Amino acid sequence: FPNPFNPSTQIYFHALERSQIDLKIFSLNGDLIKSYPAKYFDIGTNFIEWNGLNDKYNSVPSGVYVYKIQSMNHIMFGKMTLLK
């Protein structure tokens, strides 16, 4: 949230149990753009902020991106749009 966003967005998710969460952001053609190290989150609503940079700290172009949030028992996908 927000979507579309510029320059950053918060990706919200709800953890049903304390668990390790892994977040990856991809371009629409499947290229890995940003990978966040797995981290433990508490039960409830949490978020991870993405600043529109890739793993090399370069700004990514405007476009639609897909995120994948994975815990031990769940996988969630979502889309977000970066408008510059």
For the regions a language model picked out, list residue spans one by one.
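Glycine-centered coil/turn sites that cap beta-strands in beta-rich domains
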Residues: 1-27, 35-38, 47-50, 71
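Extracellular Ig-like/FN3 beta-sandwich strand-entry sites
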Residues: 18, 43-45, 62-64
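Generic structural signal for well-ordered beta-strand positions
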Residues: 33-34, 60
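C-terminal tail/sorting-segment detector
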Residues: 58, 62-84
